[in-house]
Curated annotation (Swiss-Prot):
Descriptive protein name: Small ribosomal subunit protein uS4c
Subcellular location as annotated: Plastid, Chloroplast
Protein purpose: One of the primary rRNA binding proteins, it binds directly to 16S rRNA where it nucleates assembly of the body of the 30S subunit. With S5 and S12 plays an important role in translational accuracy.
Upper classification of the organism: Eukaryota, Viridiplantae, Streptophyta, Embryophyta, Bryophyta
Native source species: Lopidium concinnum
Quaternary structure, from the entry: Part of the 30S ribosomal subunit. Contacts protein S5. The interaction surface between S4 and S5 is involved in control of translational fidelity.
Length: 203
């Protein structure tokens, strides 16, 4: 399944607020009535897991195949599969740029990376899925236009506190990955265990 490029409001209306996809809040909807039949209960449980999976896909802007690969990697690692899955997604370069406040959304961050505006440890990296590590520092190429855009984004989107695993120097225009983030620093309301359950027969 390819990356979604359709209307973003339609997605957040169905799944709720997804800050990585759009900075718009989900519209308030009236709670739907719940059917108490046994068959519908089974369907609803599947739907809940499906929607949690879709939240991850759309928030981080990844394909179904990419998400499945991340789940498989997380399953092979030691520790909580769900937490490791979130760490893998959060340490993607496009997400780090977004969490630093350099762009308003993850698609915006991906565009900067694809256009070769981003350097990691002084080297151009044009792969949005690049996995950042502790002590990596993120800078932008010395181009007046990109610096101007990012400076405006920083000023506006860093009103909320940056997560503890990251720091940003406005003077040097440099972001730093301090450490692997903990569960409390995830920038999305998500039940990752339901995502792991969804993929239990595939990963």
């Amino acid at each position: 399944m390819s990356r979604y490029r359709g209307p973003r409001v339609r997605i957040i209306r169905r799944l709720g607020t997804l800050p990585g996809l759009t900075n718009r809040s989900a519209p308030q909807l009236k709670p739907s009535s719940i059917n108490q039949s046994t068959s519908n209960k089974k369907i609803s449980q599947y739907r809940i897991r499906l929607e949690e999976k879709q939240k991850l896909r759309f928030h981080y802007g990844i394909t179904e195949r990419q998400l499945l690969n991340y789940v498989r990697i997380a399953r092979k690692a030691k520790g909580s599969t769900g937490e490791i899955l979130l760490q893998l997604l959060e340490m993607r370069l496009d997400n780090i740029i977004f969490r630093l406040g350099m762009t308003p959304t993850i698609p915006g961050a991906r565009q900067l990376v694809n256009h070769r505006h981003i350097l990691v440890n002084g080297y151009i990296v044009d792969i949005p899925s690049y996995r950042c590590k502790p002590q990596d520092f993120i800078t932008i190429k010395n181009k007046q236009k990109s610096e101007s855009i990012i400076s405006k984004n920083i000023e506006f989107y860093q009103k909320s506190k940056i997560a503890n695993h990251l720091t940003y120097s406005s003077l040097e225009k440099k972001g730093l990955v301090n450490q692997i983030l903990d569960r409390e620093s995830i920038g999305l309301k998500i039940n990752e265990l339901l995502v792991v359950e969804y993929y239990s027969r595939q990963a």
